[in-house]
Protein backbone atom coordinates (compact mmCIF):
# COMPACT_ATOMS: atom_id res chain seq x y z
CA UNK A 1 0.00 0.00 0.00
CA UNK A 2 1.33 3.37 -0.90
CA UNK A 3 1.21 6.26 1.42
CA UNK A 4 0.14 9.71 0.25
CA UNK A 5 2.88 12.25 0.74
CA UNK A 6 2.07 14.91 3.31
CA UNK A 7 2.13 17.65 0.68
CA UNK A 8 -0.77 15.95 -1.16
CA UNK A 9 -3.08 15.69 1.90
CA UNK A 10 -5.80 18.32 1.54
CA UNK A 11 -5.84 20.84 4.39
CA UNK A 12 -8.44 23.31 5.52
CA UNK A 13 -8.58 26.18 3.10
CA UNK A 14 -9.12 29.80 4.03
CA UNK A 15 -12.72 29.77 2.86
CA UNK A 16 -13.59 26.68 4.88
CA UNK A 17 -11.85 28.14 7.95
CA UNK A 18 -13.75 31.45 7.63
CA UNK A 19 -17.07 29.59 7.19
CA UNK A 20 -16.37 27.55 10.33
CA UNK A 21 -15.36 30.66 12.28
CA UNK A 22 -18.49 32.55 11.15
CA UNK A 23 -20.78 29.63 11.98
CA UNK A 24 -19.23 29.30 15.46
CA UNK A 25 -19.57 33.03 16.14
CA UNK A 26 -23.19 33.20 15.00
CA UNK A 27 -24.08 30.10 17.01
CA UNK A 28 -22.45 31.53 20.14
CA UNK A 29 -24.31 34.84 19.81
CA UNK A 30 -27.63 33.07 19.15
CA UNK A 31 -27.25 30.80 22.19
CA UNK A 32 -26.29 33.79 24.32
CA UNK A 33 -29.40 35.66 23.18
CA UNK A 34 -31.69 32.67 23.78
CA UNK A 35 -30.39 31.94 27.30
CA UNK A 36 -32.53 34.61 29.06
CA UNK A 37 -35.58 33.50 27.09
CA UNK A 38 -35.06 29.88 28.16
CA UNK A 39 -34.58 30.93 31.81
CA UNK A 40 -37.85 32.86 31.66
CA UNK A 41 -39.79 29.67 30.91
CA UNK A 42 -38.04 27.50 33.50
CA UNK A 43 -39.52 28.05 36.99
CA UNK A 44 -36.99 29.19 39.59
CA UNK A 45 -35.89 26.75 42.25
CA UNK A 46 -34.56 27.70 45.63
CA UNK A 47 -31.49 26.34 47.30
CA UNK A 48 -33.50 25.36 50.36
CA UNK A 49 -33.12 21.80 51.58
CA UNK A 50 -36.87 21.28 51.25
CA UNK A 51 -36.69 21.85 47.52
CA UNK A 52 -39.10 24.77 47.74
CA UNK A 53 -39.35 28.17 46.18
CA UNK A 54 -38.08 31.35 47.77
CA UNK A 55 -41.02 33.48 48.91
CA UNK A 56 -41.18 36.91 47.27
CA UNK A 57 -43.12 40.03 48.15
CA UNK A 58 -45.39 42.03 45.83
CA UNK A 59 -42.35 43.74 44.28
CA UNK A 60 -40.55 40.46 43.60
CA UNK A 61 -38.01 40.89 46.41
CA UNK A 62 -36.96 37.85 48.43
CA UNK A 63 -38.79 37.70 51.77
CA UNK A 64 -36.57 37.50 54.84
CA UNK A 65 -37.94 36.37 58.19
CA UNK A 66 -36.54 39.32 60.15
CA UNK A 67 -37.83 41.83 57.62
CA UNK A 68 -41.26 40.21 57.47
CA UNK A 69 -41.64 39.95 61.23
CA UNK A 70 -40.57 43.56 61.74
CA UNK A 71 -43.37 44.84 59.49
CA UNK A 72 -46.18 42.35 60.20
CA UNK A 73 -47.81 41.96 63.64
CA UNK A 74 -48.75 38.70 65.34
CA UNK A 75 -51.80 37.07 63.74
CA UNK A 76 -51.19 38.81 60.42
CA UNK A 77 -51.88 36.98 57.18
CA UNK A 78 -50.26 38.71 54.21
CA UNK A 79 -49.62 37.57 50.67
CA UNK A 80 -46.33 36.50 49.15
CA UNK A 81 -45.56 34.91 45.81
CA UNK A 82 -45.36 31.19 46.57
CA UNK A 83 -45.33 27.96 44.59
CA UNK A 84 -45.86 28.34 40.85
CA UNK A 85 -46.20 32.08 41.44
CA UNK A 86 -49.52 31.62 43.24
CA UNK A 87 -50.39 34.11 45.98
CA UNK A 88 -49.80 32.45 49.35
CA UNK A 89 -50.56 33.78 52.81
CA UNK A 90 -47.72 33.76 55.34
CA UNK A 91 -49.00 33.54 58.89
CA UNK A 92 -47.24 35.41 61.70
CA UNK A 93 -47.69 33.22 64.79
CA UNK A 94 -45.71 35.31 67.26
CA UNK A 95 -43.39 38.26 67.62
CA UNK A 96 -40.56 36.16 66.23
CA UNK A 97 -42.24 33.24 64.44
CA UNK A 98 -43.62 32.69 60.96
CA UNK A 99 -46.07 29.78 60.77
CA UNK A 100 -44.88 26.42 59.47
CA UNK A 101 -47.60 26.43 56.83
CA UNK A 102 -48.92 28.91 54.31
CA UNK A 103 -52.37 29.13 52.76
CA UNK A 104 -52.83 29.34 49.00
CA UNK A 105 -55.09 32.32 48.26
CA UNK A 106 -56.80 30.83 45.19
CA UNK A 107 -60.50 30.08 45.80
CA UNK A 108 -61.44 26.48 45.06
CA UNK A 109 -64.71 27.55 43.44
CA UNK A 110 -63.69 29.71 40.47
CA UNK A 111 -60.07 30.65 41.11
CA UNK A 112 -60.49 34.16 42.52
CA UNK A 113 -57.89 35.51 44.95
CA UNK A 114 -59.44 35.31 48.42
CA UNK A 115 -58.62 38.27 50.70
CA UNK A 116 -58.14 37.95 54.46
CA UNK A 117 -60.79 39.80 56.48
CA UNK A 118 -59.13 40.47 59.84
CA UNK A 119 -62.33 41.95 61.35
CA UNK A 120 -64.28 38.74 60.71
CA UNK A 121 -61.16 36.58 61.28
CA UNK A 122 -61.73 34.63 58.06
CA UNK A 123 -61.03 34.58 54.34
CA UNK A 124 -63.98 35.87 52.29
CA UNK A 125 -64.11 35.37 48.52
CA UNK A 126 -65.41 38.47 46.72
CA UNK A 127 -66.60 36.52 43.66
CA UNK A 128 -69.38 34.31 45.05
CA UNK A 129 -69.21 34.63 48.83
CA UNK A 130 -67.29 31.52 49.82
CA UNK A 131 -65.83 31.77 53.30
CA UNK A 132 -62.88 30.02 54.91
CA UNK A 133 -61.78 30.02 58.56
CA UNK A 134 -58.38 31.29 59.73
CA UNK A 135 -56.70 28.02 58.65
CA UNK A 136 -58.27 28.06 55.17
CA UNK A 137 -60.92 25.41 55.86
CA UNK A 138 -64.13 26.06 53.92
CA UNK A 139 -67.02 27.06 56.22
CA UNK A 140 -69.49 28.38 53.63
CA UNK A 141 -69.89 27.52 49.93
CA UNK A 142 -70.16 27.50 47.02
CA UNK A 143 -66.46 26.55 47.27
CA UNK A 144 -66.31 22.75 47.45
CA UNK A 145 -62.88 22.40 49.07
CA UNK A 146 -60.63 24.09 51.61
CA UNK A 147 -57.77 26.31 50.45
CA UNK A 148 -54.56 24.46 49.58
CA UNK A 149 -51.70 24.45 52.08
CA UNK A 150 -47.96 24.85 51.56
CA UNK A 151 -45.04 24.17 53.88
CA UNK A 152 -43.16 27.27 55.02
CA UNK A 153 -39.60 27.09 56.33
CA UNK A 154 -36.93 29.60 57.25
CA UNK A 155 -33.29 28.89 56.38
CA UNK A 156 -30.56 31.49 56.84
CA UNK A 157 -33.30 34.11 57.36
CA UNK A 158 -34.81 33.38 53.90
CA UNK A 159 -38.42 32.18 53.75
CA UNK A 160 -39.11 29.14 51.55
CA UNK A 161 -42.45 27.74 50.39
CA UNK A 162 -42.65 24.06 49.38
CA UNK A 163 -45.25 21.47 48.43
CA UNK A 164 -47.54 20.17 51.18
CA UNK A 165 -47.61 16.36 51.12
CA UNK A 166 -48.64 15.55 54.69
CA UNK A 167 -52.16 14.89 55.91
CA UNK A 168 -54.37 17.99 55.87
CA UNK A 169 -54.55 18.86 59.58
CA UNK A 170 -57.90 20.62 59.07
CA UNK A 171 -59.72 17.54 57.76
CA UNK A 172 -57.48 14.60 58.67
CA UNK A 173 -57.53 13.51 55.02
CA UNK A 174 -54.96 13.29 52.26
CA UNK A 175 -54.60 16.74 50.66
CA UNK A 176 -56.80 17.13 47.56
CA UNK A 177 -54.21 19.33 45.79
CA UNK A 178 -51.30 16.86 46.06
Curated annotation (Swiss-Prot):
CDD domains found in the cross-reference section: Rieske_cytochrome_b6f
Membrane association type: Single-pass membrane protein
Residues holding [2Fe-2S] cluster: 107, 109, 125, 128
Major location category of this protein: membrane
Entry's EC annotation: 7.1.1.6
Keyword Manganese: no
Pfam hit, one: TM_PetC
SUPFAM superfamilies: ISP domain
Disulphide bond pairs: 112-127
One biological process term in Gene Ontology: photosynthesis
Keyword entries, A-Z: 2Fe-2S, Disulfide bond, Electron transport, Iron, Iron-sulfur, Membrane, Metal-binding, Thylakoid, Translocase, Transmembrane, Transmembrane helix, Transport
Compartment(s) of residence: Cellular thylakoid membrane
UniProt similarity note: Belongs to the Rieske iron-sulfur protein family.
PANTHER family: CYTOCHROME B-C1 COMPLEX SUBUNIT RIESKE, MITOCHONDRIAL
Database matches in HAMAP family: Cytb6_f_Rieske
Protein name from the UniProt record: Cytochrome b6-f complex iron-sulfur subunit
Gene coding for it: petC
Amino acid sequence: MTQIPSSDVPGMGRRQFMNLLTFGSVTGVALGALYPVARYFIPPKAAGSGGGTTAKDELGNVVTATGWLSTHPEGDRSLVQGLKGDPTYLIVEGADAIGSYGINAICTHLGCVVPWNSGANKFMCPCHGSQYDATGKVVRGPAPLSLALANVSVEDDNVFVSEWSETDFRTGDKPWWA
